[in-house]
Amino acid sequence: VTGVQTCALPICRGGIGAFPIRSARELDFFLDYVDNPVVQEYLDGREYTIDILCDGSGRPVSIVPRERVVIRAGVIDRGRTVADDRLIDVGRAVARALPLRGPVNVQCRVVDGQPIIFEVNPRFSGGIPLTIAAGADIPRWLVELTLGRRVGSRIGQFTDQMWMTSYETSIFLDQAQIADVQPVEPRASQARGEAA
């Protein structure tokens, strides 16, 4: 802990419940307070997700970096695509280093001009609609690959500076209208409090 800013967080979605650690005493407290914590260096810089699609041989077909401009509860509320060669190179390096197949998203922060990876997820990211809207239809290309079709490299083929904003909306119903709404039972995983 000495000399390095750290944080402790529970294993969860979106870093919810993360705590900055400023001393050995705080570290001891959070190690006792948080079940199975992840302790890592605290990274202060712009956050990015890099959406990657790898073919069956692990070759990256598409790499699309996105800046996570506004994040709420671990989910992107506002973001934009960025044609940043440094981030595209990070995607290439991850694909070379790991045996990846299919969709992958890499989370990183740029600190002092250097991208630092803090997470690699072998799945679609929550912000994949922005990547698709920018012209990188990764789900469609994944289907084509699954059907045995060859998909050529699409790296760099997306609209730079495509913005997305998400929002919640409230729906107001009177008693008669709510009576017509059928209740939805939560899936077993949601009932246990796991991320969907």
Regions found by a protein language model. Name each.
Residues 140-196:
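Peripheral (often C-terminal) accessory segments that flank ATP-dependent C-N-forming ligase machineries
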Residues 54-59, 110-113, 148:
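Short acidic-glycine loop/turn motifs at beta-strand connectors
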Residues 4-46, 55-59, 85:
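Active-site nucleotide/adenylate-binding loops and adjacent lid/helix of ATP-dependent enzymes
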Residues 10, 42-43, 53, 68, ...:
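Anionic group-transfer/hydrolysis microenvironments
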Residues 34, 72-112, 117, 121, ...:
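A long amphipathic alpha-helix within ATP-dependent nucleotide-binding catalytic cores
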Residues 126-132, 149, 153-154:
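Short, glycine/charged-rich beta-strand-loop motifs at protein surfaces that mediate ligand recognition
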Residues 52, 62-65, 114-124:
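A short beta-strand motif that forms the metal-chelation/ATP-contact edge
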